[in-house]
Amino acid sequence: MKHIRNFSIIAHIDHGKSTLSDRLIQVCGGLSDREMAAQVLDSMDLERERGITIKSQSVTLNYTAKDGETYQLNFIDTPGHVDFAYEVSRSLAACEGALLVVDAGQGVEAQTLANCYTAIEMDLEVVPILNKIDLPAADPERVAEEIEEIVGIDAMDATRCSAKTGLGVEDVLENIVSAIPAPEGDPDAPLQALIIDSWFDNYLGVVSLVRIKNGSLKKNDKIKVMSTGQAWGVDRLGIFTPKQVDTDVLNTGEVGWVVCGIKDILGAPVGDTLTLAKNGSDKPLPGFKKVKPQVYAGLFPVSSDDYENFRDALGKLSLNDASLFYEPENSAALGFGFRCGFLGMLHMEIIQERLEREYDLDLITTAPTVVYEVEKTDGELLYVDSPAKLPAINDIEEIREPIARCNILVPSDYLGNVITLCVEKRGLQVDMVYHGNQVAVTYDIPMAEVVLDFFDRLKSTSRGYASLDYNFQRFEASNMVRVDVLLNGDKVDALALITHKDQSQTRGRQLVEKMKEFIPRQMFDIAIQAAIGNHIIARSTVKQLRKNVIAKCYGGDVSRKKKLLKKQKEGKKRMKQIGNVELPQEAFLAILHVGKD
């Protein structure tokens, strides 16, 4: 056991985590050169296309150190994006140490900081690594100082390496062996295994990634899932060397995968504890803190026949992604679907794209909203995650919106732009600290403003140098209203949005103008209106297409033309009463463009 090292790699987006993992695998001979590909661990197509890590991946490598001993390294490559911070905290729970990878050109960024603090809170040994020292812009001395000043860990003798060229990777491995402590645990105690992650395999059923804290797990053992109390037989178990390799036993301190033939998706939830069915442990391990979704959106299948498949797909996906929340929802405009909760906009895009690709579904998404706390006049408290659930105006005492605490790290040259942006987003400054050339600014900004496009705007005003980390702080009373959209006088529930009263006029106007672009012209006028309660605040009209009925009249009497026009007018009127307006998917996404221009 003293030869096992469990660690995660944490870093900001694009600081070279996945490339470093590739090098570690190569040096330790986890894969032959023929099988080696760039970013081996980013196994999803989506990850490769976007160049980001979405799911944490684990690998077990054997490394022969300079002291002649062979060590078993279990490491977990984690995502760097703020939306997937939950994946990171889960991975860290399975480790004793973390490599903090910092780009020697760019220095410390907000996400580095957030993940590093998570690691320190969990009492992990944090080992700083300066990556990309082969770049001409690299300045390891400055960055080492920055790490000491901003993060507060000793970094003067931080290992320097270039994951791309392979320079210094041996030193990184030696450092892991010497600096990261061996796992603690009692091999003779009853089995306790923490489920770090699970996914659904069509042939094997549920596959779980586990970290053995105490005891050991063997093939054909009878095990029990603590939360459900169900017992299963272990069919197969093993490790990843990135490839799935079968073994006969997983010992204390090891990380590996287990298949127990569980077919029910909720059979082995992430964060749960496995123990032996006979003489097992009676105490579960402390799991993970549950994350609350920050953004909610309705997802509806385009054809209602897909509803069952959609439900199964969501079930399988939520097994793999513990932070996804969903419940059935019914909309007058879109039929049956689900209200889903996500950690952020990127998370939402990724989930939608995975559902469409992996499960072959066609989906319509409604505009995302955050959760509001609503106090009714009779004192009842509601949590509203969809504009349709907001009570009538005269039943509401006050609406409180969620406020996010945003930590932004930005070079001092771009500070002005960032402050302007935060103020425009109704932010309040909490703190500002200068660290050399970097400034750490803290703002309290309404979650609704942060979630939509704050990240993109922040990147563009600071030319990509600013970085952001945010978390939910509190609910605060605010003057929020619901803007409804009416098409020919009928409310479309899926198009409503909740916004601040000061911005409701502009948002309403932008929304109807945007909708006008997306709704195709029909044989009758379509009036698009935005309303707060019964008060119409904006309107635009999609003009009808009309046939030129008087084309066949040559000269002749004007009353003849009038008669034809009148007849056409009556026909249009009749049509308007019975006609339906077809809404394309783009019209539902028009809300997303509101407030961007």
UniProtKB/Swiss-Prot annotation:
Gene Ontology, cellular component aspect: plasma membrane
EC annotation from Swiss-Prot or TrEMBL: 3.6.5.n1
Keyword Zinc: no
Subcellular location: Cell inner membrane
Transmembrane segments: none
Any one Gene Ontology molecular-function term assigned to this protein's record: GTPase activity
Catalytic reaction(s) noted: GTP + H2O = GDP + phosphate + H(+)
Binding locations of GTP: D14, H15, G16, K17, S18, T19, N131, K132, I133, D134
GO biological process: positive regulation of translation
UniProtKB keywords: Cell inner membrane, Cell membrane, GTP-binding, Hydrolase, Membrane, Nucleotide-binding, Protein biosynthesis
Organism domain of life: Bacteria
InterPro entries tied to this protein: EF-4, EFG_III/V, EFG_V-like, EFTu-like_2, G_TR_CS, LepA_C_sf, LepA_CTD, LepA_IV
Residue ranges annotated for the tr-type G domain, each copy included: 2-184
PROSITE patterns named among the record's database cross-references: G_TR_1, G_TR_2
Bilayer disposition of the protein: Peripheral membrane protein
Enzyme class: hydrolase
Principal subcellular localization: membrane
Entries under NCBIfam families matching the protein: lepA, small_GTP
Family: Belongs to the TRAFAC class translation factor GTPase superfamily. Classic translation factor GTPase family. LepA subfamily.
Function summary: Required for accurate and efficient protein synthesis under certain stress conditions. May act as a fidelity factor of the translation reaction, by catalyzing a one-codon backward translocation of tRNAs on improperly translocated ribosomes. Back-translocation proceeds from a post-translocation (POST) complex to a pre-translocation (PRE) complex, thus giving elongation factor G a second chance to translocate the tRNAs correctly. Binds to ribosomes in a GTP-dependent manner.
Name of this protein: Elongation factor 4
